[in-house]
């Protein structure tokens, strides 16, 4: 018998002041599984992550969590005031399980920034430190909201390699949220395209089949990144209504 999923969303709907943010969203996340949620701005991706975490009240549906489930969360936005003398070490010591700060930094390959002020970190360094903080809970599930934000393509490939390695080491599940409609983590088991509801879902295709990409970014990036091709049976009007047909209105990003 297969173990129950780490988390199950059933017909999850969130409405705020009469506006539907997400509607009838249903999917499972299992141990060792990586799911990437993509979609345009305003599609409800962060709302979905908050609903999964239990910090966003539901209008309808339910979120079922495996008993004792531990979740490590990496937020989309994080700002440290430059006037605040907070080092990376101290930042991690303020988190859950502060004694694990050194182990967490080692896992994300960032021991060398332990004494560095938080506000001096580069975009890629900050993302890894936030990932280290999420790891301090020894999570069964990682929820990473825009983990590659502010990171170039080569940095994305390295970050995705690290996430894959952590998944293999910790045997945890992972939900990644991304605004990139096409370029996703190659190790993703399932891509969910969200625009209030799940428009389509499927497996990414490896970019190792794209010689131009390999020539530009190298074979390491090709192993970590993949292209997702959308297959929609409907499209969205600008007022949010849904109509039959494969035309897609995700915007210019979705070429």
UniProtKB/Swiss-Prot annotation:
A Gene Ontology BP annotation from the UniProt entry = response to zinc ion
| Group of enzyme by EC | translocase
Q: Which InterPro entries match?
A: AAA+_ATPase, ABC_transporter-like_ATP-bd, ABC_transporter-like_CS, Metal_Ion_Import_ABC, P-loop_NTPase
Q: Where is this region: Disordered?
A: 229-255
Q: Can the keyword Iron-sulfur be found in this entry's annotation? A: no
Transmembrane regions listed in the UniProt entry = none
* MF GO annotations: ABC-type zinc transporter activity; ATP binding; ATP hydrolysis activity
What membrane topology is annotated for this entry?
Peripheral membrane protein
Positions binding ATP in this chain are: 39-46
Q: Keyword annotations for this protein? A: ATP-binding, Cell inner membrane, Cell membrane, Ion transport, Membrane, Nucleotide-binding, Translocase, Transport, Zinc, Zinc transport
* Entries under CDD domains matching the protein: ABC_Metallic_Cations (cd03235)
Q: Using the record's annotation, list all stretches that form the ABC transporter domain.
A: 7-220
What reaction does this enzyme carry out catalytically? Zn(2+)(out) + ATP(in) + H2O(in) = Zn(2+)(in) + ADP(in) + phosphate(in) + H(+)(in)
**Subcellular localization, as worded in the UniProt entry:** Cell inner membrane
In the Enzyme Commission scheme, what number(s) does this protein have? 7.2.2.20
A cellular component term from Gene Ontology for this protein is: plasma membrane
**Keyword Heme appears in the UniProt entry:** no
Where does the protein principally reside? membrane
Q: Which family does it belong to?
A: Belongs to the ABC transporter superfamily. Zinc importer (TC 3.A.1.15.5) family.
Give the protein's biological function: Part of the ABC transporter complex ZnuABC involved in zinc import. Responsible for energy coupling to the transport system.
Q: How does this polypeptide assemble, per the annotation?
A: The complex is composed of two ATP-binding proteins (ZnuC), two transmembrane proteins (ZnuB) and a solute-binding protein (ZnuA).
Q: What is this protein called?
A: Zinc import ATP-binding protein ZnuC 1
Q: Tell me which species this is from.
A: Hahella chejuensis (strain KCTC 2396)
- The gene from which this protein is expressed is znuC1
